[in-house]
Amino acid sequence: MSFAHYSEKIFSEHLDLFNIQWIYEPTSFPLKWGSGSIKMMFTPDFYLPELDVYVEITTMNQNLITKKQKKIKLAKKLYPNKNFKLINESQFYNFLNSDN
């Protein structure tokens, strides 16, 4: 499988290690519309069906973190029945180093 970023590959391998079922970029959520078309989409990196959560992985690039935080906030507002989680680099490494 091809991933957009190496951190997504590592995250998927750790999910596999813990036998956590995952689906890569399963759904795109429209966030903004205009002139009869979708102007902004949000496609979370992973969906974890057993936990019913959509996960977006982000690195330490502050511009990306801010953009993703805004998209997640808007997605939560537009899709309140969905569970979205942004995992930043430090949370990601804490997860990888945990003994779960």
Q: PLM features: what roles do these ranges have?
A:
Residues 1-100:
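Electrostatic, structured charged patches in enzyme active sites and in nucleic-acid/phosphate-binding
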